[in-house]
Curated annotation (Swiss-Prot):
Keywords: ATP-binding, Helicase, Hydrolase, Nucleotide-binding, RNA-binding
Any one GO cellular component localisation term in the record: nucleolus
Enzyme Commission number(s) of this protein: 3.6.4.13
Region described as Disordered: spans on this chain: 1-49, 719-851
Family recorded in the similarity comment: Belongs to the DEAD box helicase family. DDX54/DBP10 subfamily.
GO aspect biological process, one term: rRNA processing
Protein name: DEAD-box ATP-dependent RNA helicase 29
Transmembrane residue ranges: none
Regions of compositional bias (Basic residues) in chain numbering: 733-746, 841-851
Length: 851
């Protein structure tokens, strides 16, 4: 009796038994050995976490095993059961996390075999032709043991070859939006109503390339019964709105990597000036970060990426780089070098790093502080994975302190400044012990960069910049781009802006405690005291005391200062003690001080029992504000809004596109969504950047006449229209339920009649066209009236015509001037001549010429 081969798939995911004897063999124990208790259960339990438990058919499971998959990735484990159940999905996963197989395996499982009469049943939209080609190869490998036909529709290939592929009735189309819209405009018979499975791959990139309008056009041509899947690395606001409109009760699938910071990640915040960032970055890369550790550096614009790339190469460091406008081939080369550990530094922007999955990173450097807390978590979430430790270094300027407070309110982590140099000189061991305890408790300590180190490194950087013409040429573009970045990034909360003014002065960061000695600490303490020095006397008082003269106004100023200093100290004390009960502050104020501060008004006193007190502000207020959760919307909308993350573009054109733009049709400035384009020609933009008009060019008809073939996917028969999801089953229209008849077709009255209802844009365009026609007719009538008047004045002209116009004969009577072609002008020339101007000779002639 045959035993089950452990290497073969289980009975649930593999091929079913063909005979009853083989089916009974599973339940009979082996002869000579009793079956151990729980033996079969242990085998099923060992494979319960793999693809065997997903109920895949034999062909699909063999393709998965042939590809080399054994255990599903986290995104596959979460998304595939929901997709197989028929739900719409909005999933957020980085590149390299296995998301391609997460939607390809359920698609092949659903289609299984080729159906020539069903039309196009699956559609996958990719932002670039490279990604579409990669998806095609992946789908062919997974569907190796099926007879499904897959067609690739991307720009750069000939339309005729793609017509031939579409004429073979493919089951799956992998396309870029620009070329697909071109096919829909060219081929009338190409119908997407039969599509039942739609995937928007790298949806955030689709929107950033300006393909929003094309995606909406494609979405309107699909059936309402389709299953829509949306995979993205991040979720911009425009993409969230698209998901609300295009997905039906979507399930939000996201990994927990972006929701929290790893406990093994160390945070280091350095306060410095903007011009000191170069020196601080070079010091960190050379001295603090090991050469065996991989580091990713986030900057704001592509100009900073190019500047740092040249600077590092001048300093003997070879980095990799990536930004949004970079060529795809060059970007892949740089990323491959970094993944292969040929380079240890990667300089990127937020737009280029979106969806980038690089395992085993050691350090992250934030050159510019992220404007949103979720963006900070998105950056540093790449470090300290899989039990490894890592460090996130962040440069903080004075303008970024409010963002620092917003971040720690979002993370619910306490923030404290590093002890000053004076405090360290008084009790260095006690302060160091205090800081170590704070760091062990999860608190964040921020401090200054040593000024001596910055001054030393800055001198070398200036010499390098002055000796490199490329760096000199990039300085001004970097400055201008950074100013534009500051204008376009979101503002911090007003509460954090107000609290920044009351923050105490920070000292040297604890990471540099071993770098400086006691003498250098004393020098730094002295310089900090000079910075904070404020004279206690006005210039008049100082001059009066220097003159050693008695002046009654000096005594008045001293008394005034004594009174006002007490009041000022009380106000500062009141502002600093916000969380203490008000009655404690009232008890500490004497009668005369209370009179000076509050006047004769009675002080409002309150009593608060901390055990039973319920605050009107929730404890997770800042977390909810950071996630932008709206309570007045549904649960799905809240989950989508909580995942929204808009990124500031890394180049000037993208930053300007995020601001208001002048709309040529509305004749006013409008706010555009991310990735929208305003074009006056009505052209569509393909993934290669080419602009095409979405109108017929006659290519399809020429191909039909040449090959005598046609594309009949999604055929229509008179009033019958193919109804999307499946060839059998039922559909619902209004409140009445109908059963599908005859090969999945149902009768729809007037299905081919175009709609006569025009939208406001069409009405406005027709009015403008009508006004232009009227103006053109008026202009034409004015020209005709002038021409008729000219003909009337020149009736007796019998001379030659040139280009349909009368020749102006300036000398009809010899050398005389005559501006009328009939010879009735005055002649002032010498010699004899007739009225036709053919005479020669000498003499004077005055008078009117006659014919």
């Amino acid at each position: 009796m045959a035993r089950l081969n452990p290497s073969k798939p289980s009975s649930r995911g593999g091929k079913p038994r063909s005979s009853s004897a083989d089916a009974m063999a599973e339940h009979k124990p082996l002869p000579g050995r009793p079956k151990r208790e729980g033996e079969g259960a242990s085998k099923r339990k060992a494979k319960s976490g793999g693809f065997e438990s997903m109920g895949l058919c034999e062909e699909v499971y063999r393709g998965v095993r042939h590809k080399g998959y054994r255990v599903p990735t986290p995104i596959q484990r979460k998304a595939m059961p929901l997709i197989l159940a028929g739900h719409d999905i909005a999933a957020m996963a980085r590149t390299g996390s296995g998301k391609t197989a997460a939607f390809l395996v359920p698609m092949i499982q659903r289609l299984r075999r080729h159906d020539a009469g069903a039309g196009i049943r699956a559609l996958i939209l990719s932002p670039t032709r490279d990604l579409a080609t990669q998806t095609l190869k992946f789908a062919q490998q997974l569907g190796k043991f099926t007879d499904l036909k897959i067609s690739l529709i991307v720009g750069g290939d000939s339309m005729e070859s793609q017509f031939e592929e579409l004429a073979e009735n493919p089951d799956i189309i992998i396309a870029t939006p620009g070329r697909l819209v071109h096919h829909l405009a060219e081929v009338e018979d190409l119908n997407l109503r039969t599509v039942e499975y739609v995937v928007f791959d790298e949806a955030d990139s689709l929107f950033s390339l300006g393909l929003i309008q094309q995606l909406h056009d494609i979405l309107h041509k699909l059936s309402d019964t389709r299953q829509t899947l949306l995979f993205s690395a991040t979720l911009p606001q425009a993409l969230a709105d698209f998901a609300k409109a295009g997905l039906r009760d979507p399930q939000i699938v996201r990994l927990d990597l972006d929701k929290k910071i790893s406990p093994d990640l160390k945070l280091a915040f350095f306060t410095l000036r903007q011009e000191e960032k170069l020196a601080a970055l070079l010091y960190l890369v050379r001295e603090r970060i090991s050469s065996e550790e991989q580091t990713i550096i986030f900057v704001s614009t592509k100009h900073h990426v190019e500047f740092l790339n040249i600077l590092f190469r001048e300093e003997g460091l070879e980095p990799s780089l990536s930004y949004g406008a970079m060529d795809q081939e060059a970007r892949n080369i740089h990323i491959s070098k970094f993944r292969a550990r040929k380079t240890m530094i990667l300089i990127v922007t937020d737009v280029a790093a979106r969806g980038l999955d690089i395992p085993l990173l050691d350090n992250v450097v934030n050159w510019d502080f992220p404007a949103k807390p979720k963006l900070f978590v998105h950056r540093v979430g790449r470090v300290a994975r899989q039990g490894r430790s890592g460090t996130a270094y962040t440069f903080v300027t004075s303008e970024d302190m409010a963002y620092l407070l917003d971040l720690h309110l979002f993370l619910s982590k306490p923030l404290r400044p590093a002890p000053t140099e004076e405090e360290l000189l008084k009790d260095m061991e006690g302060m160091n012990l205090k800081i170590d305890r704070a760091l062990a408790n999860g608190e964040t300590v921020y401090g200054r960069f040593p000024q001596t180190i910055i001054d030393l490194v800055s001198d070398g950087i200036k010499e390098v910049i002055n000796g490199c013409t490329d760096l000199i040429a990039l300085e001004k573009p970097c400055t201008n781009a950074f100013h534009l970045y500051l204008k376009t990034r979101p503002m911090p909360s007003t509460e954090s802006i107000r609290r920044v003014k009351d923050l105490p002065r920070e000292g040297l960061h604890p990471i540099f405690r071993d770098v400086l000695g006691s003498d250098e600490l004393s020098a730094l303490a002295f310089s900090e005291r000079l910075k904070s020095f404020r004279p206690k006397q006005t210039i008049l008082e100082a001059e009066g005391e220097a003159a050693r003269g008695s002046n009654q106004w000096l005594d008045v100023m001293k008394k005034k200062r004594e009174v006002h200093e007490g009041i000022i100290n009380l106000v500062h004390q009141k502002n600093n003690v916000d969380h203490e009960p008000k009655e404690e502050l009232v008890e500490n104020i004497s009668n005369w001080e209370r009179k000076d501060v509050c006047g004769n008004k009675r002080k409002l006193q309150s009593f608060r029992d901390e055990e039973y007190y319920i605050s009107s502000v929730p404890q997770n207020q800042h977390l909810e504000a950071g996630l932008s959760v709206r309570a007045n919307e549904g649960f799905v909308e809240n989950r989508l809004d909580a995942a929204v993350l808009d990124l500031v573009d890394d180049e000037t054109s993208g930053m300007q596109a995020q601001k208001t733009r002048y709309h040529w049709k509305k004749n006013k400035f409008v706010k555009l969504n991310s990735g929208d384009r305003v074009t006056a020609t009505g052209k569509i933009k393909t993934e290669s950047g080419a602009k095409l008009k979405p109108t017929k060019t006659g290519i399809y008809k020429k191909w039909q006449q040449k090959t005598h073939r046609s594309i009949d996917t999604g055929r229509k028969f008179g009033g019958f229209a193919e109804e999307g999801a499946s060839t059998t089953g039922s559909h619902q229209r209004g409140n009445r339920k109908h059963t599908a008849v005859g090969r999945g077709r149902r009768y729809i009255p007037n299905a081919d009649v175009p709609s006569e209802i025009r939208n406001p844009e069409q009405i406005q365009k027709s009015r403008q066209q009508k006004a232009m026609d009227i103006a053109r007719m008026k202009n034409r009538s004015t020209k005709e009236s002038k021409f008729q008047k000219f003909q009337k004045n020149n009736r007796r002209h019998d001379g030659p015509l040139k280009d349909g116009k009368f020749q102006k004969n300036r000398r009809p009577d010899g050398n005389g001037k005559n501006r009328r072609p009939d010879g009735n002008g005055k002649g002032r020339g010498k010699g004899k001549g007739n009225a036709n101007g053919f005479g020669k000779g000498k003499g004077k002639m005055k008078g009117k010429g006659t014919r």
